[in-house]
Every structure is written in C-alpha cells, then in structure tokens.
C-alpha cells in the first residue's frame, strides 16, 4: 500500500469524526444537558477519570483511569456506537492511561495500552510488557513507519513495534515493581534524573521528543502551591536521559499534527503554569520561546499537579484548535508560532473537569472526571464530616460547538513577576491581554513601596513591560475582564426547583451508593428513595442503606458564621474571609441545617452554596478560599447538591407540577430531584450581593478589616459612614490575585455626623479581595453593593 492510499484512508477516518456521522434521531437513550446516564463509566478504584476519547471506524473509543495504578486496574476500554450503545471491551486491562495517537502508516489507533485496527480488532500491550502509567504517544524519530513512542507519568520511555507490539524499554519507569510482578520486557537500567514527576504530554518534532510533567516529590507540594515543581524536557536518542528545558509545571505537548503524534519540522507547543500565571512554550526552528497567559480558575493550581487532569490542545474541526487550560476554553490558532503569535483568545469558562475531548459528528464529546471515591487532599471543615461517594464514576458530556462560547465569563489575572528581583532594562515575557475589554497592569515595587496602575490600550495583543529601575522585590500583575452579559433571572432549566420564599420544599440528602449498585441514595425527612441509570426515582425499603446515608452524609451546622455585616468563613488555616449575601432569607435555612454549604461536585472540585450564590472553591492545596470566585447568584431553596453519573443533582423541589424534563419525580409523587450539568449553573444569573467587612463595628485606629470578596462582580460601589464628630480618612486596599499582597487603592475622607460617603468602582478595576482601614478609632460601616 503506498503513501497516497494511507492519506486517503486517514481522510476517510477523520471524516467520521468531523462531520459525516449524523446522530440517529429517536434512538438515543435518555439524556439531560448533553449527559447520557447510561454511558457512565465505573471502576473499583479511588478515582475514575476519562483518559482519552477518540472517534475511530465510526465508533467512539474511550478509556478510563484510576489513580496511580501502573500495573493495571479495573478500568475499561469502551466502544460506543453511533446510536450511543456502550460496549465494555473484554480486552480491558486498566491502569492509569491517557495516551492516544493515530498511526498513519499502519492505520491503527493507539489508545492506552490498546491498539485498534480498521476493523475494530483490539490488541493489548499488557502491563507486564510495558509497566507504568501511560500518559503520551508520539511518532518515532528514526523509524516512524514501524514504531511509536510511549511515555509514562514517571518519566519512563518505550518504543513499540506497531506490527508485532514488541516493546523496548529506553528509560526505566520510575515506579517500584511489586514483588509478585514479573515484567516480560527487559527494563532499561537508565533511571531518569529529570526533575518532577506526574508526566502529561508527549510529542515529536525537529529531531527531538518533547515531554512534560507537572508534579514533584517535595513534601511541600501537598500544602504550598508556590513550591517549585514540574519540568519540560526533551530527548534525542537511545541512551539519553530527558534533558531539562524549563523547571515549571507543564501539561500538554503537541503541535499542528495533533493526534498523529508529531512531524518532521513543524512547531511544538507546551502549556503549563507556575504560581504567577500560565506559561506557553513554543519550539520553532530549534529554539524555545515563552509566553504568559492569565488564569481564569485557580482550581487547577497545586504544586503536586494532581488537580489538572490532562489539559489538551485538540483539533475539533474548526478553523482554530481548542485548548482547555485552568478552567477556560481557548481558541488556539493552528499556525501559532513565535514568529506569528496571534489569535489565542478566551472563549468561556467551565466547571467540569475535562480529561480529553474530540469532535464526533456534529457535536463535541468531552470526557470528564466526575466523582471520585477518594477526596485525596481535598478535605476541609466547611464540608463537615460528609463521606465521599460510594463508587468512583465519570461520564461524557456532549455539547454543540457553539456552547464553547456560551458558558461562564472569563475574568482573569496573572503575574509576570511576583516578588522577584529585577534590573533596569529587564523585559517581561509577553503576556496575553487580547480577548478582554478591561485590561489593567499593576506595577508594584514592594521594596520602594510604590504602586502604579496602567490601562493597557485595546489594540495590544501581548503586553510586555521593560523595567526602569532595580528592585529586590518587584511584581507586575495584570487583571482582565469583560462586561457581564447575564441578567439576574434564572433560566427555565431550573423551573421546578423551590424558591427561597416557597412554603413547601421537597428536599433531602443524597449520596452515590457503593458495592457496584450504581444508584443514588436519597432520603427525605420521612422516606428513602434510589435513583438509577434510567433516571427512575423509586421509593425503596432498605433500612440499612437509609441509616448509612443519614449517618454519612448529614448537613453540618455551624461551619460558617453569619453576622449583620456579611458571611464570615474561617478556613482550615485560620484565615478569615467575608462574602456578600445575594439574599438574606437564606440565613434561616443555614441556621436550621436545611442547606448544605459545601460539597465536592467533580473530582477534587468543591462548590460553595451560601447566601444565594454558588462559588467555585479551590482545594486547600491550591490556596482554597483565597482564590474563591462566584459562579452565579440565585433564589433557589436547594437542600443538597452533588454529582451522579456525571450529572449535577439538586434536592429541594417545589410542590408545584412542572413539565421541566430536568425534574425527576419519585414514583410515589412525593418528592423529586433536579438533574443537569454542573455548567448549567452559569444560567442561574450573574453574581450579585450586598454586605461588607464592617456594619456598625467598633474599630481601633489603623485597624484593617477582614478581606471582603470583590472578584467576579459588576456594578460595584462602597458606602462608608462613622459615628465620630470629626472627619476620618478611610483607606481602601486591594489584594489583586488573592496572594495576600495588599496595595493601596484610594483614601476617602468621610465627614462627621454619620454622613454617608459613597464611591463607585470603575468597570476596569478588578481585584480578588478588598479591605478597609480606619485612620481613627470609631464605630464604622463599610458596605458594598454588587448589582
């Protein structure tokens, strides 16, 4: 078979992925918000994430992974037909795989340890032949027609013959072999010295193999997200170890050839991050260049790298590629290079944890990491003693391509320098500012105690700064935002959920069951129910299961404080944070223990529901409340929230009847649940609220208030008043990124006699937290309105 025919076959195969496949109407299983509960995937491990999703031979092929399982697991290879019928392949051997590549010459799909030909025959490379957590594939450097590379998460490197599947070990995988494990492949004695671990991407081009990892074995990574971690490396030939390119956390490595694994001379891209911002590395003509992008979400931070899954840059059949990174969808031009660095743009923010994605027919398929049996390091007192889910599970999310631009807003921030030493003439990395209307640079010289604010012109795509004087402690921070386009009205998707002023509320608590039952246990005050994969909610007599649920998933009390000023949270490190109320009527539900405050809604992702607002709450190892962001405000009387088969579940249903398909009524008609996608929450409405750090509070001279959340709100103003018979100056200070670095914003002289002074904040001003300082002792009110 000649190369021309290979190319024709590839075009035919990709045609199935990009447009020829049409959904068969009337034969699809039940779905809500693009999630089919019948397609949920389960394992017996502490996590069940989606490692790869690839269209091949008309079907969709999917693999799942468990956490740190280099020698196999209960995870499966799935084959999904155009009618969305799921087949669990008997060849499954599990593990922690996330690799995928189409080998053009042999017309085989490599996905995890599986090799699938044009007739959907599956061959397996067992863990005994290739131990390790398989994270990436790439084209071979010297024999690409006959071999492919595999890399592992612990820096292992193999080459595999695509015909015989013979494995050659080039760099030994970093996992210690169990005593009862007998490898069938002679393992290399070369053990990598590349810093970091927790490998992610792999790609070959320009005579080298490029590899990324995003973790480190330093014990500080479990608590301090600023710990040095991760590496970007390259490899040239057998006998070599990985050569360090840059010591930061990196994830995806790819280029214009994408799933084909590399090319001869094209560019390569790698996306990563540090405590300051995102880092984009570009290889062009043998030279590496670096760029910086802002972070939309901080839930992906954490020096251990566990919170990221596998960020990707993939072809979805559009003019631009799609990049997922730090909670945002991004346009990524196919021709992006150091010489042509134009076109990267934020599209919208998302809440799902996405491991891989692809175009299949007329929709995008996002493979998610939805519900993990283990909370890993993601525990905190505000959640109470709730037990984690009974069985790990995840699902696929099908969306129209247009939805990539329709989810959440993308206010973002990042730093180029953060408490760094600089010299006159030092130039910053180029920092992306295109795609946002409001673009502000903050030049903070901590050593010389100066702060300068600059508005970045609208025609600038990449902002670059040149240092004018030396400093031993210098920061350059960029904040970015657009106008909020949502209103305050909830979408009809939430019709049937009880409102805060409803007298009757069919609420209750729930938890995913274990023991492979694959149901959701749900208990109201009086009865016990179970929800199954067909979305049937049935009353069940099971006293043991009911007692277990009530004892393991109670709604905790007294995990937050409510006072006249605002919502006060004291986190696990003793830090104090204040949040606005969207509706004070929720106070009574919280006080009575009728509303869950915090719960994990996706793997290692907590959501906070307090005062009528949902907030995204990063894990404590990603700095927790310091990086909090509001998602949406609402008037829903939600008792409990969580996940099941990839769906977001809400309890607290109105007694009124509704035809909303998102409301699943029980078979006895006494209760119900709301089901949808976690990213439906954006449709509840824009974040709003009122409150402040002080309300008629006695404060001493130069006392500073608790931090009060400012990020993610619009139409903001502050009102100041005090009780003294003289004018008093109040200082307003900002923490731009939630790093604890406070800068002076403005001072306001507030007149005597309890006369209010009000200040409206301009739309271009964005900061994570605000605090107030009184220059004299007084009883003061600092009251903020976010409308």
Where are these regions (language model features)?
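A short helix->beta-strand "capping" segment at the edge of beta-propeller domains
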Residues: 27-46, 438-440, 444-454
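Repeated scaffold domains used in trafficking and secretory/extracellular systems
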Residues: 45-52, 92-106, 129-146, 174-207, ...
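Entry beta-strands of beta-propeller and related beta-repeat scaffolds
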Residues: 59-62, 106-110, 144-149, 204-211, ...
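Beta-propeller domains
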Residues: 61-94, 112-126, 161, 171, ...
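Residue-level signature of beta-propeller blades and closely related beta-rich strand-turn architectures
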Residues: 66-68, 114-115, 153-155, 214-217, ...
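Beta-propeller blade signature
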Residues: 75-82, 159, 224-240, 279-285, ...
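Blade-level signature of beta-propeller repeat domains, shared across WD40, Kelch, NHL, RCC1
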Residues: 356-421, 639-698, 709
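Noncatalytic modules at the cell exterior or secretory-pathway interfaces
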Residues: 762-778
């Amino acid at each position: 078979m000649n190369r021309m025919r290979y190319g024709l076959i590839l075009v035919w195969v990709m045609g199935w992925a990009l447009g020829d496949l049409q959904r068969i109407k009337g034969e699809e299983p039940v779905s809500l918000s693009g999630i089919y509960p019948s397609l949920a995937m389960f394992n017996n491990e502490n996590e069940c994430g989606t490692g790869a999703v690839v269209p091949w031979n008309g079907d969709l092929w999917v693999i799942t992974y468990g956490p740190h399982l280099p020698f196999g697991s209960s995870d499966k290879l799935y084959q999904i037909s155009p009618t969305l019928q799921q087949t669990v392949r008997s060849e499954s051997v599990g593990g922690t795989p996330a690799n995928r590549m189409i080998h053009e010459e042999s017309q085989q799909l490599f996905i995890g340890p599986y090799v699938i030909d044009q007739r959907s025959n599956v061959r397996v490379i067992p863990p005994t032949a290739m131990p390790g957590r398989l994270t990436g594939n790439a084209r071979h450097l010297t024999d690409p027609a006959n071999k492919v590379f595999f890399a592992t998460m612990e820096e292992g490197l193999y080459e595999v013959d695509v015909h015989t599947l013979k494995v050659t070990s080039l760099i030994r995988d970093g996992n210690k072999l169990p005593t009862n494990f007998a490898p069938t492949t002679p393992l290399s004695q070369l053990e990598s010295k590349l810093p970091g671990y927790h490998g992610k991407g792999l790609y070959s081009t320009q005579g080298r193999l490029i590899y990324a990892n995003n973790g480190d074995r330093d014990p500080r990574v479990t608590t301090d997200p600023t710990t040095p971690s991760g590496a970007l490396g390259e490899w040239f030939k057998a006998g070599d170890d990985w050569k360090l390119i840059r010591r930061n956390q990196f994830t995806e490595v790819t280029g214009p050839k994408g799933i084909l694994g590399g090319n001869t001379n094209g560019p390569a891209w790698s996306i990563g991050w540090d405590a300051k911002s995102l880092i984009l590395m570009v290889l062009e003509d043998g030279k590496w260049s670096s760029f910086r992008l802002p972070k939309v979400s901080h839930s992906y931070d954490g020096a251990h790298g566990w919170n990221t899954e596998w960020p990707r840059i993939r072809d979805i059949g559009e003019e631009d590629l799609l990049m997922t990174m730090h909670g945002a969808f991004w346009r990524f031009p196919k021709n992006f290079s150091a010489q042509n660095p134009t076109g990267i743009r934020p599209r919208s923010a998302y809440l799902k944890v996405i491991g891989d994605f692809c175009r299949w027919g007329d929709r995008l398929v996002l493979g998610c990491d939805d519900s993990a049996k283990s909370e890993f390091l993601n525990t905190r007192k505000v959640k109470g003693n709730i037990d984690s889910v009974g069985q790990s599970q995840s699902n696929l999310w099908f969306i129209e391509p247009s939805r990539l631009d329709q989810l959440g807003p993308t206010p973002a921030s990042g730093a180029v320098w953060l408490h760094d030493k600089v010299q006159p003439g030092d130039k910053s990395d180029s920092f992306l500012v295109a795609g946002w209307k409001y673009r502000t640079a903050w030049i903070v010289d901590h050593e010389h105690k100066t702060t300068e604010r600059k508005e970045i012109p609208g025609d600038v795509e990449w902002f670059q700064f040149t240092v004018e004087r030396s400093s031993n402690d210098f920061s350059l921070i960029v904040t970015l935002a657009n106008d909020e386009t949502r209103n305050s009205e909830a979408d009809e998707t939430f019709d049937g959920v009880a409102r805060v002023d409803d007298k009757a509320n069919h609420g209750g608590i729930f938890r995913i069951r274990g023991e492979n039952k694959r149901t959701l246990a749900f208990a109201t005050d009086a009865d016990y129910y179970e929800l199954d994969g067909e979305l049937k909610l049935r009353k069940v007599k099971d006293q043991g299961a009911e007692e277990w649920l009530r004892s393991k998933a109670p709604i905790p009390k007294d995990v937050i404080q409510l006072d006249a000023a605002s919502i006060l949270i004291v986190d696990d490190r003793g830090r104090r944070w204040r949040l606005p109320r969207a509706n004070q009527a929720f106070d009574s539900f919280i006080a009575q223990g009728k509303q869950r405050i915090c719960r994990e809604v996706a793997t290692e992702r907590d959501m906070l529901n307090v005062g009528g607002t949902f907030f995204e709450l990063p894990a404590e190892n990603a700095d927790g409340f310091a990086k909090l962001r509001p998602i949406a405000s609402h008037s829903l009387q939600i008792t409990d929230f969580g996940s099941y088969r990839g769906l977001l579940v809400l309890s607290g249903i109105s007694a009124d009847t509704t035809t909303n398909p998102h409301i699943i009524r029980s078979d006895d008609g006494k209760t119900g649940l709301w089901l949808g996608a976690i990213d439906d929450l954006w449709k509840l409405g824009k974040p709003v609220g009122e409150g402040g750090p002080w309300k008629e509070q006695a404060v001493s001279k130069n006392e500073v208030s608790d931090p009060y959340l400012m990020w993610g709100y619009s139409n903001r103003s502050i009102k100041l008043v005090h009780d003294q018979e003289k004018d008093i100056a109040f200082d307003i200070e900002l923490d731009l990124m939630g790093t604890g670095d406070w800068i002076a914003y403005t001072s306001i002289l507030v007149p005597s006699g309890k006369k209010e002074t009000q200040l409206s904040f301009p739309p271009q001003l964005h900061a994570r937290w605000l605090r107030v300082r009184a220059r004299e002792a007084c009883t003061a009110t600092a009251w903020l309105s976010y409308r």
